């Protein structure tokens, strides 16, 4: 399925490949924003709200490009990170949950790894002969 819908019909309720790609790009963007010590913008909040909503205009190519751009931005931010700031406090969300700079960077990496794995399994299962 092209759109970033939360469930692909034949997948038994599992998240679709499109959802994983959209979520991957969004989580990277949000975690890196918090890691910089910044609040989310209205645009980021709107994108978060739209993540699980089917959108036929989101093609697989556009979703993959958005994720690739997110990875490029993450790598650039990591390269520019001053190691002296890694234990600095950062705050997440409207509730301002305390976290460390390094904690957010690690969480972004772990969450991305998890969803890439889920994406690969989803695509393999969807492509399997029936």
Region locations from a protein language model:
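Short, solvent-exposed coil/turn linker segments
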Residues: 1-2, 82
């Amino acid at each position: 399925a092209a759109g970033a819908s939360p469930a692909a019909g034949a997948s038994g309720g599992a998240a679709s490949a499109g959802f994983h790609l959209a979520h991957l790009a969004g989580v990277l963007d949000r975690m890196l924003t918090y890691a910089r010590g910044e609040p989310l913008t209205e645009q980021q909040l709107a994108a978060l709200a739209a993540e699980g909503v089917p959108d036929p205009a989101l093609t697989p190519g556009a979703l993959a490009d958005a994720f690739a751009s997110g990875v490029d931005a993450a790598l650039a931010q990591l390269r520019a990170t001053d190691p002296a700031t890694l234990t600095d406090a950062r705050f997440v969300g409207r509730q301002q949950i305390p976290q460390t700079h390094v904690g957010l960077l690690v969480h972004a990496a772990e969450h991305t790894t998890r969803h890439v794995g889920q994406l690969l399994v989803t695509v393999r299962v969807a492509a399997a002969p029936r």
